[in-house]
């Protein structure tokens, strides 16, 4: 019995000092409150808090409708075939938006949006392929000179003919002028056909750019202000790659599955586009927690307190700044329209979804909303088509 008590006393926990070398103290991972809960509220009116989830849902619908606005007449001019409204609504040529992060105070709402502007990238790529490379060539400059010389000669001859006709037939001056205008417009259309389409693309880019300007956003801000009865501030973050946000990563798959049912093909294309780099596991810095180095004698004499060195330490200790793995899953009625097969499930992944520092290094990590991993972004989208309902899930892991 005494041996059991002695063994318990030896194995019981004993307090140790912070400066003890056997203790490993690591930086604690602090995650923003908005990542933990999708909206953070600091308000005193209890009755207003009950309606905030419904209001935020309507506001997100309004914001998505604003960024999905398009000019059907102008877009149809850039196509040979007729542009149908149904296919335009499910087109991937749009501005993709994530779920909003709402921060409520007593008199203001701060809305953070992550945006991937696919429409702008598409138009810039088309301009580069079709026009910008053409304009740089010497052949194009020679053609412009030829159009100028030939056009001036034709205009001079036509002007002389019109003067003769107006002198001989003064009653028919208006008819001569209309025929002359028709001739001019036909000549301009033939000679500057490519430049006309170039101007259409420039107009589309201007409309896309105007959606992010304050003058056009003011109308949206006024509508959101009427819903919340508060001042509204937008923080729009433009993402370089679409796989940096799980909501934006899953939206193209949902839109493509509404058109056609090539599930595996779309999954492979989206997963292939995600670029994942090899992660080098770095040791956590314990230098700031060693209290012996903060003596008044040696603190000012240290060379390691330079701004570049401190910046390097801070950036190396930042968490969740690199994508380490992605996964997509589609399930539901993914067969063709008139087939009698049942629901299907298809998955594709790339990289690793594990939290590398906690699973391999054994470092402590926080948990979101009770059971969600801090390094994972998870999204579920439910949608319907003519065949039936289907769902899309997306995971993005970061280190």
UniProtKB/Swiss-Prot annotation:
UniProt KW Ribonucleoprotein keyword: yes
Compartment(s): Mitochondrion
GO BP terms, alphabetized: translation
GO molecular function: structural constituent of ribosome
Keywords annotated in UniProt: Mitochondrion, Ribonucleoprotein, Ribosomal protein
UniProt function note: Essential for mitochondrial protein synthesis and required for the maturation of small ribosomal subunits.
Full protein name: Small ribosomal subunit protein uS3m
């Amino acid at each position: 019995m005494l041996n059991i008590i002695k063994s318990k006393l030896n194995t019981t926990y004993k307090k140790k000092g912070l400066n003890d070398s056997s203790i490993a103290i690591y930086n604690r991972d602090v995650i923003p409150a908005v990542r933990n809960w999708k909206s953070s509220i600091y308000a005193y009116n209890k009755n207003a808090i009950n309606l905030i989830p419904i209001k935020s849902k309507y506001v997100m619908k309004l914001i998505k409708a604003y960024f999905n606005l398009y000019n059907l007449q102008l877009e149809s001019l850039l196509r040979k075939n007729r542009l149908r409204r149904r296919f335009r609504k499910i087109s991937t040529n749009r501005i993709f938006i994530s779920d909003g992060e709402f921060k409520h105070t007593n008199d203001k709402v701060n809305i953070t949006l992550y945006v991937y502007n696919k429409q702008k990238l598409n138009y810039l790529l088309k301009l580069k392929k079709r026009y910008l490379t053409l304009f740089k060539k010497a052949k194009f400059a020679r053609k412009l000179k030829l159009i100028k010389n030939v056009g001036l000669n034709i205009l001079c001859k036509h002007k002389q003919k019109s003067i003769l006709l107006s002198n001989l037939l003064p009653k028919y001056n208006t008819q001569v002028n209309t025929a002359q205008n028709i001739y001019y417009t036909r000549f301009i259309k033939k000679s500057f056909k490519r430049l006309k389409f170039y101007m259409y693309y420039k107009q589309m880019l201007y409309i896309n750019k105007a959606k992010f300007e304050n003058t056009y956003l003011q109308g949206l801000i006024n509508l959101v202000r009427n819903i919340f009865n508060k001042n509204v501030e937008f923080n729009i973050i433009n993402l370089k790659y679409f796989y940096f946000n799980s909501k934006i990563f899953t939206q193209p798959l949902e839109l493509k599955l509404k058109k056609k049912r090539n599930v595996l093909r779309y999954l492979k294309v989206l997963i292939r586009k995600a670029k994942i780099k090899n992660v080098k596991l770095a040791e956590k810095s314990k230098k700031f927690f060693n209290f012996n180095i903060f003596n008044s004698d040696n603190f000012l004499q240290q060379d390691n307190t330079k701004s570049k060195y401190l910046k390097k330490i801070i950036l190396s200790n930042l968490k969740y700044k690199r994508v380490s793995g992605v996964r997509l899953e589609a399930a539901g009625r993914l067969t063709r329209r008139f087939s009698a097969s049942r629901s299907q499930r298809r998955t594709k992944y790339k990289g690793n979804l594990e939290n590398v520092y906690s699973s391999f290094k054994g470092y402590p990590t926080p948990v979101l909303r009770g059971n969600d991993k801090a390094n994972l972004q998870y999204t579920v989208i439910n949608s319907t088509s003519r065949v039936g309902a289907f769902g899309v899930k997306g995971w993005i892991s970061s280190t």
